[in-house]
């Protein structure tokens, strides 16, 4: 495994561990998810460029489209929760609470 792949994999792992550790606030969770998506995008792009996969060249762009949709939905959920409850705690997303 080259150092480029190792660094990208470590960035993904750090983002995933951050998602597991800092899941009390919605903004922290969204930032960790964006870090994971960015590392996946870079990994896919580097793999496609190194292996000359011409048929899979649209996959990173499709991943970016899904990442943008995820970010838009996450930020709209953040605005809705912060307007309703006044905080951005993930525990406020539980619909079973009264």
Curated annotation (Swiss-Prot):
Core subunit of the mitochondrial membrane respiratory chain NADH dehydrogenase (Complex I) which catalyzes electron transfer from NADH through the respiratory chain, using ubiquinone as an electron acceptor. Part of the enzyme membrane arm which is embedded in the lipid bilayer and involved in proton translocation. The chain crosses the membrane at residues 1-21, 29-49, 61-81. It comes from Eumetopias jubatus (Steller sea lion). GO terms for cellular component: mitochondrial inner membrane; respiratory chain complex I. Core subunit of respiratory chain NADH dehydrogenase (Complex I) which is composed of 45 different subunits. This is NADH-ubiquinone oxidoreductase chain 4L. It comes from the Eukaryota. Keywords: Electron transport, Membrane, Mitochondrion, Mitochondrion inner membrane, NAD, Respiratory chain, Translocase, Transmembrane, Transmembrane helix, Transport, Ubiquinone. GO terms for molecular function: NADH dehydrogenase (ubiquinone) activity. The gene is MT-ND4L. It is an enzyme of class 7 (translocase). One of its GO terms (biological process) is ATP synthesis coupled electron transport. Its main location: mitochondrion. It is a multi-pass membrane protein. Belongs to the complex I subunit 4L family. Its EC number is 7.1.1.2. It catalyses: a ubiquinone + NADH + 5 H(+)(in) = a ubiquinol + NAD(+) + 4 H(+)(out). It is found in: Mitochondrion inner membrane. InterPro entries: NADH_UbQ_OxRdtase_chain4L/K, NUOK/Mnh_C1-like.
């Amino acid at each position: 495994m080259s150092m480029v792949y190792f660094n990208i994999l470590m960035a993904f792992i750090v983002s995933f561990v951050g998602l597991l550790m800092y899941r009390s606030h919605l903004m922290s969770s969204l930032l960790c998810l964006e870090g994971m998506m960015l590392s996946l995008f870079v990994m896919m792009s580097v793999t496609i460029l190194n292996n000359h996969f011409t048929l899979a060249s649209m996959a990173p762009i499709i991943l970016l489209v899904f990442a943008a949709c995820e970010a838009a939905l996450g930020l709209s959920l953040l605005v809705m929760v912060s307007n309703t409850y006044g905080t951005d705690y993930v525990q406020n997303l539980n619909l079973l609470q009264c």
